[in-house]
């Protein structure tokens, strides 16, 4: 079945995740002083909460494309990136367990989401790949190999910096733009 559609199961799950992401955005961005009770943990300073909230809004927009879009090839590249993010969030949760609002409904929702997502998101990607024609549409821009290689290089550098910051956060705390 190579018709480049987004399958109903993929759409439905993406739609549910969008609801979680929009809710997280609302709490983190508009109610940063209430993250201790309304979110999985208390985030300080408030600017960090708003920063995370804006990232969740970006994720909601991307996954809304999977929930409401038409073509699989337009959204398929997001799924591996979301998988990496959810794995990192699960690891961060386990590493910083004591900082979470354990036993609260927001934390339980967080924990379930980040235990299930690292498996569910790649499973959806594999499931929906059977519809991919691997052919660009006539209106699609074909990116040159040079641009793709430069982008991969930059992406690799960013991934390296993020990985270092993830495991050695003190290296970045002093240069974080707000404290």
Give residue ranges: language-model regions.
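Structural signature of hydrophobic alpha-helical transmembrane segments
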Residues: 45-55
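Short, Lys/Arg-rich, polar N-terminal cytosolic tail immediately upstream
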Residues: 1-7
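Hydrophobic, ordered structural segments
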Residues: 58-145
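Hydrophobic alpha-helical transmembrane segments and adjacent interfacial helices
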Residues: 25, 29, 84-99, 156-167
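Surface-exposed interaction/gating patches
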Residues: 7-26, 134-179
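Membrane-interface interhelical loops and short amphipathic "cap" helices
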Residues: 30-45, 99-107, 167-179
């Amino acid at each position: 079945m190579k018709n480049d559609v987004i399958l109903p199961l993929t759409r439905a799950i993406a739609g549910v995740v969008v609801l979680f992401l929009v809710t997280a955005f609302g709490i983190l961005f508009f109610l940063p002083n209430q993250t201790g009770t309304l979110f999985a943990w208390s985030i300080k300073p408030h600017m960090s909460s708003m920063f995370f909230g804006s990232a969740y809004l970006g994720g909601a927009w991307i996954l809304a494309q999977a929930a409401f879009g038409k073509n699989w090839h337009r959204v398929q590249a997001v799924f591996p990136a979301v998988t990496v993010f959810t794995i990192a969030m699960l690891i961060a949760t386990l590493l910083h367990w004591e900082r979470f609002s354990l036993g609260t409904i927001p934390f339980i929702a967080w924990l379930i989401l980040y235990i299930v997502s690292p498996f569910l998101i790649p499973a959806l990607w594999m499931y929906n790949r059977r519809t991919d024609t691997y052919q660009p549409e006539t209106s699609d821009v074909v990116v040159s190999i040079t641009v793709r290689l430069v982008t991969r290089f930059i992406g690799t550098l960013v991934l390296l910096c993020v990985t270092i910051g993830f495991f050695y956060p003190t290296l970045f705390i002093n240069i974080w733009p707000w404290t």
